[in-house]
Amino acid sequence: LSKDTFIFELKQNGLVIQSGIFKTSVEPGTTKTMPVQFKQINTPGYYTKTIYYKTPLGIQSFDQQVFEVKQDQPKEQAMLVVEGKETIGIQFIDTEYLFDKRKGLVSIQVNDEEILKQAPKPVFYRALTDNDRGAKQTYANWLNASLFQNVVDFKMIRNSKCAQMIYTIQLESIEEECKLVYTVYNNQSIQIQLHLDKNSQRQTLPLFGIEFALKKEFKNFAYFGKGEKDTYIDRDHALTDFYFENVDTNYIPYLKPQEHGNHTDCKWCSLSNDTIQVNIKSEKMECMASKYSFMHLYNANHTFELPQTNTTHLRITKQQMGVGGINSWGAKVQPQYLIDQSKNLDFTCTLYISKKD
């Protein structure tokens, strides 16, 4: 190892705040411990501690720790809740949320500027990959469960700190229900919870999450997670960092359009236009942003068949099954990379709005 180099690096919110290089010599068949003194951290933010092992031919491997120093909650504001026959409006000084009792969160306005194109929906399906097709997996029940949803019950719970909207949604194709819960706090944030009861007898579940449809101007995508290339649960040997994409250019032109653009082990992501940033955070999630929905990709046989769109789609998931194909094409996803449906599925994330400088 005497010719090899170790590099250590500490990043805060994607910026290097400490780095260094050291070498060592280890006799064959022995081990040696080398202490690395990182700075004490107390400033809020997302951090990575990374050590790279580099030979004269280049970097060979790395090890990494990821952690967050949480910041204080935003200040509470006056929150006005107005309930009508079909809708519930929640108003702050410059932000307003509108919930339809049959459709969900149908509007987010900041200074009278609309952000959403459609209400967020639970999503359980992905555009089939070449490996899915090769393994003759269609997951048809989950396609229909993502497309055909019916709110069968709604209720609101209100207290001095928050207003909670609880939707019970019938998934016709699997004859089961899921729950989608929005909790609006008086700091303007929305906690979003998705729940599906356990059932190990179901068809393989491709993914479990929520898809948002925003106006196309929200095309600047950022995330803190594994990147910068696509990562999946069985393809996630990547560095955690802050990465940036533009949904106008992040499409991958496979011969047949298919699932792409996923990022694992994310803690935060955002979509922004010139003035407003929509943020979503979670302890652990997977995310992707695209100008195409999974149905756009699913329906097209060739890239030229994809439509011109006026929407940015953001998919946030607890987990997506792996992509499989360990024999290069057609092999089913290995069991350890499938979603475990023998346990209840619960996913929680928080949405909040910020203004760009």
What are these regions (language model features)?
Residues L1-L98, I192:
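Carbohydrate-binding surfaces of carbohydrate-active enzymes
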Residues P74-D357:
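Beta-strand/loop-rich accessory regions of lumenal/periplasmic or secreted enzymes
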